Swiss-Prot record:
It is found in: Nucleus, Nucleolus. This is ATP-dependent RNA helicase dbp7. Residues 28-128, 452-481, 685-755 are annotated as: Disordered. Residues 169-368 form the Helicase ATP-binding domain. The Q motif is unique to and characteristic of the DEAD box family of RNA helicases and controls ATP binding and hydrolysis. SMART domains: DEXDc (SM00487), DUF4217 (SM01178), HELICc (SM00490). PROSITE patterns: HELICASE_ATP_BIND_1 (PS51192), HELICASE_CTER (PS51194), Q_MOTIF (PS51195). GO terms for molecular function: ATP binding; ATP hydrolysis activity; RNA binding; RNA helicase activity. It comes from Aspergillus clavatus (strain ATCC 1007 / CBS 513.65 / DSM 816 / NCTC 3887 / NRRL 1 / QM 1276 / 107).
Amino acid sequence: MADDGLLLNFSLGDSNVIKAEPKLKGGTWRDRLSARKIAQHRSKGPRKPGDENTAPRVPRNPNQIEVSATRPQKRQRTDGGDGGRPQSHAQSNQPRQFISSLFTKNPEPKNVEEVKEEGPVEEAKPTNAPLIDGLDTFTNLGLSPSLAAHLLTKLELKAPTAIQKASISQLLKEDGDAFIQAETGSGKTLAYLLPLVQRIMTLSKPTTDATGQPIVHRDSGLFAIVLAPTRELCKQISVVLESLLRCAHWIVAGTVIGGEKKKSEKARLRKGLNILVATPGRLADHLENTKVLDVSNVRWLVLDEGDRLMELGFEEEIQGIVKKLDARQRPSRIPGIPTKRTTVLCSATMKMNVQKLGEISLKDAVHIKADPEDEDEKARLANKEEDSAYRVPAQLKQSYAVVAAKLRLVTLTAYLKRTFMRKGSVMKTIVFVSCADSVDFHFEVFTRKKQQTDDADASDEEKTEEKPLSPHGTIAPATAFSNPSNPVTLYRLHGSLPQNVRTSTLASFAKNREPSVLICTDVASRGLDLPNVDLVVEYDPAFSAEDHLHRIGRTARVGRDGRALVFLMPGCEENYVEILKRGYRDGGKALTRVDANDILKRGFGGNVEAGKKDWDVKATDWQCEVERWSLENPQYLEMARRAFQSHIRAYATHIAAERSMFNIKELHLGHLAKAFALRDRPSKINVPGLRQGKEETKKDFKAERRPAAGQKRKADGADMGDSKSSSSHDTATSAQKMRAKMKEHMAGASEFNLA
């Protein structure tokens, strides 16, 4: 086709001009990616004002707020704000706080059982009460008339319990070893102390012709040693022993326990003792280093709470004590003293470790039980697959409540408010938690001063009356669940407190005749006979079934009535109910379930039948008030974080047989943090010893690898700018470590389960 001379000119415009993309070379791939994005952004060019009219119109959403394309002019604030001051962006680096609702997204209980209404219940016959038969008196068991009269007149004990009847007659009749097994609260302490005192009183009956004084006195030597696992139990045994020895003043008893000065203990040993109550560790120390401690005349050795002795790791100490007693035993010149030593082992359970302790200390021991004639019971226990069998007192009314993690704190508060609503209904309550840090946190929450409605109107005198944060303040008014007609005193107790503070706190709680609550760890769960304890609350379930038995054994003692409540969370913890049922002779028919919402309604809403709907609002307001109180006080916020951390670490220490019921992987840490008045994400709760979240660990690792802006990197990978401040950084780090170490020694709440 021939060229006709026509020339075509097409106008494409500036927007459709094809531009060559530059090829980027060199640098890292991050730098090339950033440069490519910048080039693409520049190639688009500025947006023309008329382009918005040519864009397709999107149908309007009635719920969408239209925003103008042109930015309106700012107006000056007239509400007393900062005006034109530029806003600081420092808050963007702070951890975001999320205030979740108490009653949303809570897991539902898996096992839905019918909640039994409270009504007239058939009274169960007490299984640990003194015998009613008039023939079973202390005199008929072989005790001297003076000791029996002392029990009747001074101690007001008219008849022995079943275990006391069986053990006193056996230990007075024979000199062989014995294993005493009885349920908690049945009087095991007197079961071995009465034969011990009676045998030593029998040795002192012959008198010399010259002076007329008993042959046995404090210089005659040490005849008996009683070992107990905890200092509190040693103190209690010593108090009971001193009350018995008031009828035999020439017999002297003493204690050697940890936490006291060894110099004072050596002075007591130098003066002379006939009966010694001790902890295994301190006794082993004295046997090794104290020459004045003469054990050649020791003829009675008692191991109280044998299962706890083994759990606390005293096996080596006890084995060494037994070997030293055997090696140092010598024939005595005192007439009537046994030729060989008698060892008595006491325990409420028959576990494998108790049997191992018996192999170490006992030889041909007699098994003493409260009901040896019950052959059906013995046969049934022999066919059980478990290595231990524990029994709950029949008169103890036990219940459990399935409470969501977020509702734990408010539910406990509501239950205590309802318990102490009327004066005289409940005198004393013990609340068991898993760790010492949790004890300190809940003590501060329940004893905090209520916030003023108007801080400006509060006088200076009212501000000075606020309770200071004291590391050893263990007694305070319980403002969270007290009322004007029934004030309640709150106590706290755990193993990290100094020994003198623990002793004084426990004595004050025992002597207090007004309504009081003791919040504690398992340090108060073994052997302590605290009078008038009507209720036991297991806020955190025990680490084993045996520990649960000893916890609830603080109530319903020696025939008295008692109640116990266990808090469980929805999910795998509900299977723990089967463990609770095993402790009953009737298969758990007496075990009842309490609805968590009913507890909240009764605690925060008053009468349930009134149909009030504001109980959930009151519970939410109380929870938010505690959270604000925690945020406004850095020392309490740090305490809450430590309690949260220690609780999680303690949660993982359940025994292997029950670990499937307390699976730490199924814990909702965010919901659990709500129970400690925390609004932070669990990964943001940075306290010493708590592992950071995965994202924060990656960020810190990358930040350490990258040099700061304007700094050069050395050949060894360190930043040049770091060398200038290395000395100051090391000084600050060492000072911080020193403060943390001092705080650990002063506060003493670093452990999560001390007994």
